[in-house]
Amino acid sequence: MQHYSVSRRIRRLTIAALSTLLASAAAVTVSAPAHADITPTTLVNGVLSTIGGCQSPVRDAIVGCTRMETLTTQFPVVLDLNQLGTNIVVLGAGLFPDGTMRPVLISRLQAALQVARRYPLSPIIVSGGVPKNGITEAGAMRAWLIANGIPWFRITEENTSRSTVENARNTNGILAGRGATSAVVVTSPDHLQRAMVDFRTAVAGRIPVAGVVAP
């Protein structure tokens, strides 16, 4: 019953806020570069991730709101609204015993690379510990991004986490320390919804958290 009530309130907020965001998005469309992914999906997700209920200190509200979002490879509008303050967060996945990356992690990095190239002012955080052969997930991700043309100074390693919950908690410390205004989490389709719930819970409503699915 409580979940139903929360979901109903979220829907009311979403409907009420959508016209406002549409007006804002229209302004962005005029002033922002043509690369902005402003579509019905990203607009609705943008409402939900901010005033629609996902930016909340209440976990039940976060869970209900996050379930209403559409997982997509399209880039969130928050990146165009504040590129410099939005951090791109790439989540790790278990390495092979020799320290090399599994295909699932390379897929996440390829998706993050597209975001990073389109938004060259956005800082990047690579999150993951669990070392194999002396190499952490974050270390492997950082090396891959640098090898693919991302400047080293854009990348911050969070190399101690061992779970998605720890990814969120540890990365939140970095985001808070640098005064980030929002975060975009990049991970696999079967991981993103849970990851966004964990990150939104960790930031406790301080900043909006959006997501990008790795194909």
Where are these regions (language model features)?
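Secretory targeting and sorting signals
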Residues: M1-A36
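A structural signal for short, hydrophobic/glycine-enriched beta-strand patches
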Residues: Q2, H35-P215
